[in-house]
Amino acid sequence: MTERMKAVAAAGAVAAFWLAVWVFAAVLVAQPLILPGPGAVALALLRLVCDGGTWAILVGSGARILGGLALAAVCGGVLAGISSRLRAFARLVAPALSFVKATPVACVVVLLLIWLGSARVSIAAVFLMALPGVYFSLAEGLAQVNKPLEQMFRLHGVRGWRLFCAHTWREVLPFVLSCARAVIGMSWKAGVAAELIGMAVGTVGERIYQAKLLIETADLLAWTVLVVAASWACERVLVWLLRVSGPVAWRAAVRAHGHGLRGRAGAASDGAAAELALAVGDRAPWAPALDGLVLNVPAGGRICVMGASGMGKSTLLSLAAGECAPCSMVFQDARLVEGSSALDNVLVCADARVDASNATTLLRRLVPGIDVHVRVAELSGGQRRRVEIARALLCGGCAVILDEPFTGLDAAARDATAEAVLDLLDGRTLLLATHDVVDAQALDISDIITL
């Protein structure tokens, strides 16, 4: 028996157990008005399903509930986005939403009935009940976005909607999925409760109230089954759509690579080299070796920064990158989208003139025998390093900045990689940080700054 068959059998056994409990309880009570048996409820459910009016009512209530949920998602996303940038705004909004979150649904519905009337009460109730859950989940997700990876994307010219698709949405998506599983079911409960309390005409809540007045317990349970089924179906569909949205957003960002590359501080938008002048001043007080340092790199020049660990080499390169962004950079720490392929990691930051064929050729030159479609998480440290170098070489911008680029490579791999860097530098400025003079020699750099 397969695992799937075992799971189905286990679920069937659980359902049979609770059905038996229901039958036993109904027989024990012996009063259909209090607890009808499964047969009576099944007949009532069949009658409702065969009635076309039932579906119109269910669809109408569902549309209002989903409308309130969609409004909460939009407003919660906007509020969370603002809160992630402005701490004062977050401190202002959080108490109000925490209060709404703790308020009983009945109290909210009664207030909404006074303010809005019964026609719009379900939409407003769902909105208010879902908004805190959406906001706090998105705020937490945005607070935990991988900042170093975001820095890498921005530096390589991936901004705006492409940054959102390639990075932000993928980082926040697990929090959104967790929120959706909790909020969708709660929204159906809040919406139906609002309809019931407000006695809105032509709604599921009204039908449940009528069943209660007429003591039609079987109909009441049948409507409950329909609401639970509708809530379950909505949750499954929406969660599936959210899961699919992650890969779809990533593919959109990869296909649109090279869009929006614009430099500043003299950086040429066409990728031509530009002069780099950097006065560190007091911008790096934690690195005394950089105090007062002035870095001047002529257009197309090559400079190596050497020094012991902790002297500020990486800090200097980061400051330089900020002056000429967008440019390409290999960071000292690995910055890759682990769940995506080596090819996509290169293409997402690549110049618009680069296609999959160019990227594949370079990857296979740097990493002989590589499967470019394999996830980078499955590659060795040296292979991952060369994927980052390929990404840097195929990115637009006016400079290539390499921070300890040959870490994890043997001498042969280092020399082959350095040769590829020189072949594809294309006149751009090259800035290298290393502790090994051999790296500078491999890249034909004679101008060395020692910290």
Regions found by a protein language model. Name each.
Residues 389:
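Hydrophobic anchor residue at the start of the ABC signature
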Residues 403, 410:
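ABC-family nucleotide-binding domains
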Residues 356-371:
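Conserved ABC ATPase "signature" region
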Residues 333, 339-352:
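Q-loop/switch helix immediately C-terminal to the Walker
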Residues 124-128, 161-194, 227:
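Transmembrane alpha-helices
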Residues 375, 404-405:
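Walker B catalytic motif
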Residues 375-379, 383:
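Conserved ABC ATPase signature
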